[in-house]
Amino acid sequence: MANKKIRIRLKAYEHRTLDTAAAKIVETATRTGAQVAGPVPLPTERSFYTIIRATHKYKDSREQFEMRTHKRLIDIINPTQKTVDALMKLDLPSGVNVEIKL
């Protein structure tokens, strides 16, 4: 797998679990002899939801909720077969979405 690159995008609602998952991936990749670029923090996606508090009337009384999606990007440069095998067996915390591109 010479001159190849693995790009890993991580998404999570909690930034602490996202950072621990990114640290595990970086530590595993460096331990198996690959070069790592990242984790690079990507812009946080924010979603707002406005809901009427009362059931039938009092439309002026509303409540707003926000949902944030934190993202990180990790590039693994020149991965070996040992690196790929170690990443496949890696156990990441729940709540972290992982997208891998070769």
Swiss-Prot record:
InterPro entries named in the record: Ribosomal_uS10 (IPR001848), Ribosomal_uS10_CS (IPR018268), Ribosomal_uS10_dom (IPR027486), Ribosomal_uS10_dom_sf (IPR036838)
Pfam families the record matches: Ribosomal_S10 (PF00338)
GO molecular function (one): tRNA binding
Tagged with keyword S-adenosyl-L-methionine: no
GO process terms (BP): translation
A single Gene Ontology CC term: ribonucleoprotein complex
Keywords: Ribonucleoprotein, Ribosomal protein
Keyword Ribonucleoprotein: yes
Self-association state and partner proteins as the record states: Part of the 30S ribosomal subunit.
HAMAP family in the record: Ribosomal_uS10 (MF_00508)
Protein's name according to its UniProt entry: Small ribosomal subunit protein uS10
Gene that produces this protein: rpsJ
